[in-house]
Amino acid sequence: MGKQMKEIIKAFKQKDYTLFDQFYEMTNRQVYYAIIQIVKDDEIAKDLMQEVYMTFLNKIDQFKIDGNVYAYLSMMGRNSSINYYHKQKKEVHSDELIDMIESDEGVNEYDDTDDILSLLNLLNKDQREVVVLHTINNLKFKEVAEIMDKPLGTVLWLHREAINILKTKVGDWYEK
């Protein structure tokens, strides 16, 4: 975690929330994509994001300063989405990613959410989750494996399969 993020977390632990807007700007995409891949509804995703941030701030004392805040918030978002899903007893829709998947920048600078979601919809649930956690949330494969409770080799294989699917589909779209 960067020095700036550590300072923000320290301020939160002292009940100083003046840097919340900055914190939100640094983390909202990761939380949004962790949620939207499960609930598939923008308004619900935004509501769940509010819950995630409120819960995070209410339980800030439990968060370790050296912890990965992005992974922590993503996991909270994912869990809140799953809880919402179970409460609603809705069928989970599949979701998938983009042609920027292999870039080092991930999709943090990419603003076309609809394109991202339609590409994510090309993948199965596990592939999509690996892509979102690794590419959008910038987590290391080892962290993704821990979150998904899968062996590292499986996570790497799922990522490679997802990349191949996305390359094929994106290529087909460009040829049209």
Positions of predicted regions on the chain:
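N-terminal module of bacterial RNA polymerase sigma factors
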Residues: M1-Q30, I147-M148, T168, D172-K176
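DNA-recognition helix of helix-turn-helix
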Residues: I82, E146-K176
